[in-house]
């Protein structure tokens, strides 16, 4: 089911409620203990905080982000990564909904240190990190494209200061916005999802 929840972004509570209810109904039917949010800041926010208010009750399950789950599995020794580490100079963009609102700051860094031999922080990282420019549904508004590209200038300064060979993030929305802006500025910088990077280095 769609979890990003365009209803919340549009301010339409009925659509928002319907989208959350589908996930809740499926989770209850399966009697799951956890619903794992993917690399999407808005999905995590919609399910974790907005969802119970929209459906009018507390969940019988827990919503966790994929990064929280991966970090937990690593700590429990249930997944292991290869001894060979990624040698590229990488940095991490903190998605606003996941980090600032969700408080998931340490987990992505724990995972990055497991797979990267050259991870470097940007200035003002974590809860102080600068938005990608597409937050609050701005990425869906074509009229805001010029402003979105302009606001990326602040993020570009952060990136230029550390000179990464790859930019890692954990939100599909951030990734799309960052890729568009990087292309607009003619930067040679691949954007990776943290989950896919970890997957590359999982030990069989």
Regions found by a protein language model. Name each.
Residues 1-204:
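Iron-sulfur cluster-binding electron-transfer modules in prokaryotic oxidoreductases
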């Amino acid at each position: 089911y769609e979890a990003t929840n365009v209803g919340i972004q549009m301010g339409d509570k009925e659509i928002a409620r319907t989208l959350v209810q589908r996930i809740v109904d499926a989770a209850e039917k399966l009697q799951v203990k956890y619903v794992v949010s993917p690399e999407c800041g808005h999905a995590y926010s919609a399910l974790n905080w907005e969802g119970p208010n929209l459906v009018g009750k507390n969940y019988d399950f827990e919503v966790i982000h994929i990064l929280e789950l991966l970090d937990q599995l690593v700590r429990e020794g249930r997944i292991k990564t290869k001894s060979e580490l990624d040698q590229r100079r990488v940095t991490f963009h903190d998605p606003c909904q996941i980090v600032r609102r969700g408080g998931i700051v340490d987990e992505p860094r724990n995972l990055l240190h497991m797979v990267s031999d050259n991870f470097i922080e940007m200035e003002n990282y974590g809860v102080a990190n600068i938005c990608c420019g597409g937050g609050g549904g701005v990425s869906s508004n074509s009229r805001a494209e010029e402003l979105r590209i302009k606001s990326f200038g602040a993020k570009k300064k952060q990136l230029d200061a550390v000179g990464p060979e790859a930019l890692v993030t954990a939100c599909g929305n951030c990734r799309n916005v960052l890729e568009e802006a990087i292309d607009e500025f003619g930067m040679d910088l691949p954007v990776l999802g943290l989950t896919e990077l970890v997957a590359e280095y999982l030990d069989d």
